[in-house]
Each structure stands twice: as structure tokens, then as C-alpha cells.
Amino acid sequence: MLLYKELLQDKKNLLAFSAGLDSTALLFLLLENNINFDIAIVDYDLRLQSKEEVAYAQELAQKYKFKCYVFKAQTIEKNFEAKARAIRYEFFEELIQIHNYDNLLTAHHLGDRFEWMLMQFCKGAGCVEMAGMQAVDKRSSYTLLRPLLHLDKQELQKYLIKNDFKYFLDASNNDEKYRRNEFRHKYSKPLLEKYLSGIKKSFEYLDEDVKELVLDIETQQCNELIYFKSSHSKRSDIIAIDRYFKSIGKLITAEEKALLKIEKTVIISRKFAVSQTGAYVCITPYFKAQSIDKKIKEKLRLLKVEPKLRAYLASDSEALEFLSLLLA
């Protein structure tokens, strides 16, 4: 039932656990397949049940001899979904860095992917955005794996019931004030119940189309200078830029993506400059304009480096020399 088992074997795996249906199914499937892993759970302290969920996670860890990391989050007043996600991934990535995990495993399933596709479609999206989350997602220091992405929630529930495995139901998943829940209950769940096999097949076709339509561009690095050779397809270049930022835990806004289509240089999150420089797309830290040595300034001018990249390159002689050779 698991996708990409070969990427999990003989690796250090960290499972994002909640004690809910999805992550509990993944936990027992990992055990069933003799894959080693530890778990991490976040207690947002919003429900009385959360204490029971943490206790269950610790009970499983003791029974099956793996580590259980628990993080107690501070109260979130507003924008719960986005802030909870940020807290969760910050915790996971800290554990990955400290304990040298190779993979982060999440229990996203076909229903999650379909919800995302519908939400993107309603916002305005191409086939890349609608294909959405992938089973294998390379990040800067680890690989994010979603081994259940081909399975529907009902298939996971049947597995748990058949084996009499305990799991918890989170009542907040029924609260339609959250947009994802609204899409789930009104649209994706009824459609999956009626057209499951067709929807699975459609995602297979979408994944094939994305591979054909979008070039696989790999970014390179010299210090804090990130670069790749432009594909001469704005669409492919923007997807490569987007993937790089996702790999370091940053998201590009829709407005920033729109600017990347028409501008030669765009500032992302007020921290990064993205620029077409010669035949290359370059990403650097963004420094505000400052005094630059005359010789360096002239060198940057002759290289035709965009002004918003110059302050960083003036501060990093190695990156500047590397870019000079690259553009020669």
C-alpha cells in the first residue's frame, strides 16, 4: 500500500503524527513493512482530546520501541491553519537538523490532493498547480515523502477497522469555517465517493502531462548565490524558482509570481532578489542599495548585473568572481 518503500528502507525517517485516522494508518503500515521511524506530534491545546492523542502517541512509541517527540504550542489567536502549519514544520525541521533525519513522512492522501486541486482550480491555476502535492518532494536538507498519496481516506479507514487499530477523530475537521473543510465536505468527498477510480486515473495523467510540459531544472549554488540556466520558458523558470523557495520553506505569493512573468528583477518576501542575468536566473539575498567600491561597481556594470543584485555580490567576492566566470 505504500509508495516509494525503497526510499524509506535503511533511512532515518521522521513521521509527522497526529493520532488521527491518516497518520495512524501510515504508522501501522510502516510497522507492517518493517520500516524504521520515529514520530513527532504537536499539541495545540485547543481540545481536551489533544492530551489523549499525545498520550496515545507516547504509548505507541513505548510499545513499538521508537522515539516520540512532543511540542506544546502556544495559543494561536488568529489565522490558525497557516500559523499551525508554520509551527508544525518549524518543529519537524528542527528535529531533522538535530537528529539528522533523511526523510519527513506525512500522511497526505488522495482526498487531500484532490481538495488542493479543486482549491487551486477555483483560484486560477495551470496543470502544474492542479497536479499539486507530489509523493516525493526534495527539500534543502531532507526529502518530504507522502507514501499514501494514491489512497483515499476510506481505504485507510477500512485498513484500520479491519485490523482493529485505535485512532482519533478531530471534530474540527468538520468545521466549514476553514476553507479546506468546506471544499472537502461539499465537493471533494462526494466526488471521490462516486468517481474514485476516474479521479485516480486523472492524477496519473496530470503527473504525466507535467513531466512533458515542464522542464526539470536543477538549481546550483555558490555561497548564497543560487542560479540556473534559463530554459527560455517563463513558465518553467518560474516553477523552478517556486520549487527552490519551497525547498527552503518559503512560499512565493500569487502577486510575486505575476511580477516574475513581466519583470526582469523581483524582490521576494523583502529578503531575496530574483533576476534574469545574462543566460541565467539568479537568486541572492536582497541588500538595500549601499556604497560600492568603484572597481567592483564598474565590474558589475560591465557584467550587466541587475542593480538589485549588486549590493550582495559586492559583499561576496567569491560569488562575484564565480558569476564573472559563469557569464564570460
Indicate residue ranges for each PLM-predicted region.
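Generic alpha-helical structural element
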Residues: 149, 172, 176, 195, ...
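Conserved anion/nucleotide-ligand pocket segment
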Residues: 182-199
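Alpha-helix boundary/capping and short turn/kink residues
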Residues: 123, 127, 192-196, 250
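Core alpha/beta nucleotide-donor-binding catalytic domains of modification enzymes
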Residues: 1-185
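Short, charged, solvent-exposed linker or helix-capping segments at domain edges/interfaces
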Residues: 81, 194-198, 292-297
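Generic structural signal for hydrophobic core residues of well-folded globular domains
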Residues: 121, 148-151, 190, 206, ...
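AMP-forming adenylation/ATP pyrophosphatase catalytic core
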Residues: 6-11, 18, 138, 203-328
